[in-house]
């Protein structure tokens, strides 16, 4: 991370994962101007939330991540989490990933640890959206 101040991605990731809306998150931004995050929603929870709220949103992963209501709700979760961190550690932008991260999908190791390089590769278009 460019500035002298170093950030510890796992601290921010764990804080974000306290949200019921967020299943997985990977903080990115090494050698970039700001920290950002790739977020995999808790799709089941989000679908229930959509029903509770009566939003007219298809319960497909793609429709959920594309919806303004879901994007805004996740922004609130990120904003709340950011309050716990210094300015330089705060997540400035995020992208929602369309599929659950899994061992089979190559996102996770058999012990459920994130394969950061694989996730970066899979979602490189999303990373480009963030930093361009």
Annotated model-derived regions:
Residues 89, 123-132:
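A short N-terminal helical cap/helix-turn-helix that marks the beginning
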Residues 2-87, 100, 105:
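AMP-binding/adenylate-forming catalytic core of the ANL superfamily
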Residues 27, 93-96:
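Hydrophobic/anchoring residues in structured secondary elements
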